[in-house]
């Protein structure tokens, strides 16, 4: 059964979700079988802290599934931060492909999988991946602002894939896909998703 709680900011949606968590606990559902997932690490932490203020006998270890989906995948896959593509890796790819990249990184502090870059090539490639369409399909949607060369776009995507394969690295989208492929999903009886409208298709 699936329910949606809809409302503008500040109307108590998170409080409502936490009240529902408490109802399941009162009915006998174990906390390690309840998942509460938020779009950002900050939002997940705030929800966890608010719940712990109510349930003072509990600790963070008791509600380990209050997190982002990327944190869940990262932990279940046993990854380390050095396994994940970083800003420097994308800059090196840019040097190989002849494009200047000042910054290109995921918001690792939030672990929400949001990718930002000053290169519209990289942004377009990442957008296509989270939408689960090809980069050329995304290009043909004409949602980009700058001029994008079709052949260069294809070459950059191939270089990213080759680079990751050569150095054994993954990005945040790979992380979710690998998690799904390995099917190492914790046995949860109920799942809450805060700000579900912000999730990508693959999430």
Which ranges hold each PLM region?
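Catalytic P-loop NTPase motifs of RecA-like helicase/translocase cores
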Residues: 12, 73, 193-202
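Hydrophobic, Leu/Ile/Phe/Ala-enriched alpha-helical segments that form helix-helix packing faces
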Residues: 24, 51, 55, 97, ...
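Short beta->alpha junction loops/turns
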Residues: 10, 40, 180, 196-197
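P-loop NTPase Walker
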Residues: 1-83
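Accessory N-terminal region flanking or inserted into the helicase ATPase core
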Residues: 1-7, 16, 33, 106-192, ...
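Conserved phosphoryl-transfer catalytic core
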Residues: 84-111
